[in-house]
Amino acid sequence: MATIKVDVVSAEEQIFSGQAKFVALPGEAGELGILPGHTPLITRIRPGAVRIESESGDEEFVFVAGGILEVQPGAVTVLADTAIRGKDLDAAKAEEARKRAEETLQNAKSDIDLAKAQSELATAMAQLEAIQRLAKIRGKH
């Protein structure tokens, strides 16, 4: 089966680099599925899980807190604001971040504070959802 080169990078480090049969991620207008031969594309991505199906059929999960997706012939690049490997996700930290964001939202004094709190809440909720999805998948194996 055909594959495509996939790179997931954050400002801090390269999170994933390898060949894949399929990539799924949260695009700005909805969930995107990328197969080899996909039309070139540049779009923003929302916070959520990136699912990468490797050549061997294994799945790799990476949580991204938003960023940019670039699809070129033979290559997919995810430039993430923040990226965390699925195995490194921490439900307790994500839940604490959600609570802090909700508190900040309640006490927002300006539009800037409100927008920041909404963004932090969306990221924490997406991270918790990614953790739940990953737990379901791990439970099947």
From Swiss-Prot:
Membrane topology: Peripheral membrane protein
GO cellular component: plasma membrane; proton-transporting ATP synthase complex
Main location: membrane
Alphabetized InterPro entries for the sequence: ATP_F1_dsu/esu_C_sf, ATP_synth_F1_dsu/esu, ATP_synth_F1_dsu/esu_N, ATP_synth_F1_esu_C, ATPsynth_dsu/esu_N
Subcellular location(s) per record: Cell inner membrane
A GO molecular-function descriptor: proton-transporting ATP synthase activity, rotational mechanism
Disulfide bonds: none
Keyword annotations from UniProtKB, A to Z: ATP synthesis, Cell inner membrane, Cell membrane, CF(1), Hydrogen ion transport, Ion transport, Membrane, Transport
Domain of life: Bacteria
Transmembrane segments: none
Keyword Ion transport applies: yes
Quaternary structure and partners: F-type ATPases have 2 components, CF(1) - the catalytic core - and CF(0) - the membrane proton channel. CF(1) has five subunits: alpha(3), beta(3), gamma(1), delta(1), epsilon(1). CF(0) has three main subunits: a, b and c.
PANTHER family: ATP SYNTHASE DELTA/EPSILON CHAIN (PTHR13822), ATP SYNTHASE EPSILON CHAIN, CHLOROPLASTIC (PTHR13822:SF10)
Stated family: Belongs to the ATPase epsilon chain family.
Function: Produces ATP from ADP in the presence of a proton gradient across the membrane.
Annotated NCBIfam families: ATP_synt_epsi (TIGR01216), PRK00571.1-4 (NF001847)
Protein name listed in UniProt: ATP synthase epsilon chain
Species of provenance: Burkholderia mallei (strain ATCC 23344)
